[in-house]
Amino acid sequence: KEGYLMDHEGCKLSCFIRPAGYCGRECAIKKGSEGYCAWPACYCYKLPNHVKVWEYATNRC
């Protein structure tokens, strides 16, 4: 599974003012294989199926 990580409000996890490597660390915490800042939000690859990712259809932000 891949996609944008979400914050506690269900919005994309911002990386706009974060240091280099921030998204990779956040993706690793969620057990993803890798991630990067797809400006302005963190995008992850190979996440476990139980991890919730941002979806356009259910966007509230």
From Swiss-Prot:
Belongs to the long (4 C-C) scorpion toxin superfamily. Sodium channel inhibitor family. Beta subfamily. GO terms for cellular component: extracellular region. Has the structural arrangement of an alpha-helix connected to antiparallel beta-sheets by disulfide bonds (CS-alpha/beta). One of its GO terms (molecular function) is toxin activity. This is Beta-toxin Tce4. InterPro entries: LCN-type_CS_alpha_beta_dom, Scorpion_toxin-like, Scorpion_toxin-like_sf, Scorpion_toxinL, Scorpion_toxinL/defensin. It comes from Tityus cerroazul (Scorpion). It comes from the Eukaryota. Disulfide bonds join C11-C61, C15-C37, C23-C42, C27-C44. Beta toxins bind voltage-independently at site-4 of sodium channels (Nav) and shift the voltage of activation toward more negative potentials thereby affecting sodium channel activation and promoting spontaneous and repetitive firing. Keywords: Amidation, Disulfide bond, Ion channel impairing toxin, Neurotoxin, Secreted, Toxin, Voltage-gated sodium channel impairing toxin. It is found in: Secreted. GO terms for biological process: defense response. Residues 1-61 form the LCN-type CS-alpha/beta domain. Expressed by the venom gland. The modification Cysteine amide is found at C61. Coiled coil: none annotated. PROSITE patterns: LCN_CSAB.
